[in-house]
Amino acid sequence: MTLAEIKAAVDQGLIVHWASPSYRVKRHDAGGYYIAHDSGQAIALTHHDGQTLNGEPFEFFLAT
């Protein structure tokens, strides 16, 4: 998935995972996006440039 596809899916209320179902892309109150693990740890969806994903595009997928 591209960055735009990931953001659009999350904004539509769809569940987007990264690498495994244990990781989920979420949007925080300030409007940014992050990848959260079931354990509670999280990282930003992108690098500081706001464009480069923290992960490969093929690793992101919609929940079934």
Sequence positions of predicted segments:
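Short beta-strand-centered aromatic/proline hotspots
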Residues: 22-32
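SH3/SH3-like beta-barrel fold
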Residues: 34-37
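Mixed-charge, Lys/Arg-rich low-complexity intrinsically disordered regions
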Residues: 1-11
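Intrinsically disordered, low-complexity, charged/polar segments
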Residues: 41-64
